[in-house]
């Protein structure tokens, strides 16, 4: 079975790079640039993992946390990774409280992100 990923980031070059990277590794990959678009995809497709930026646009610092809540409510088996270049201990604590599976600080090499995604999906399949 091919795993399906959802990449949510407001920066197009990041979405394209991640989509290309994971597609070449055999994943089915969808992407969204904003929370509403991501939620529409989540209603229509089953994802093994969602990789979302914490801050999707200026002034919407909680978008990643809102996506996290939406996924955990509607798709509890889907793994969630939040990416951020901007964080604080309080935000990370709140993300963990809401059920994030992994918090990754940018920048992180794609190869390392790929290993983390693969490991997280494998853990989910074993539980």
Pin down the residues of each PLM region:
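Two-component/phosphorelay signaling modules centered on CheY-like receiver
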Residues: 12-30
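Acidic, metal-coordinating helix/loop segments flanking the phosphotransfer/catalytic sites
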Residues: 31-49, 57, 73
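Short amphipathic alpha-helix used as the core "switch/output" element in two-component signaling
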Residues: 40, 62-77
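Two-component signal transduction core modules
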Residues: 50, 80, 103-104
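C-terminal output helix
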Residues: 90, 108-118
